[in-house]
Amino acid sequence: MSVENPIDQTDLTFFTNEEGHSLLSRFKSTLKDTQLFDALVGYFRASGFYQLYDALEPVEKIRILVGLSIDRDSYDMMQYHQELGMIDYESHQRTKKKYQGNLKEEIENSDENDNRLEIGIRKFIEFLKADCQDPVIDKAFNGNGKKLEIRAYPSKNIHAKVYIGKFKPEDRDYGFVITGSSNFSESGFVANREFNVELRSKRDVLFAENQFNTL
């Protein structure tokens, strides 16, 4: 049995990727005013970076923590287990190299006929190499001096999908938190039916920010 209640189509709290309510559209709207953007996700795909890179261009600092969903026992069954056995404890430099390799493999194995994945990979690597525009904010968050940092989270149990944006000081709002079902991918941002909610109170954003900074 299906019962549908009337909803406000202008609601900007929930994002399901239905028409007019895609997570990608919301990011494109809010990231233009964002100074610091953090993402804690189960997995990362070049397709997602392609969808978002233009909106991320003006963001001064981007930090991505990726939780690997495959467990240690599964790694042991793989031929390259020795390389992946340290993934839970990789430094930024090793993680960066690993994900660059994974993204190149993704484009080689893709059936897509266009160059979207190639652009996503190129922009991803470009952001990794670019200097952070604001050394002060980079130092405040113990950054490495670059626009984009990516690390593997040191736990095999992480399933969170959380996106945190901190606005520029002159903005009337502090920032936003979006959490729900969407991973950092085209499917999560546009294609799949998802369920995400955005929180705007400073208290919620600070809580999420503090949790992220402890990882």
Regions found by a protein language model. Give the residues of each.
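PLD/PLD-like phosphodiesterase catalytic module centered on the HKD motif
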Residues: 1-215
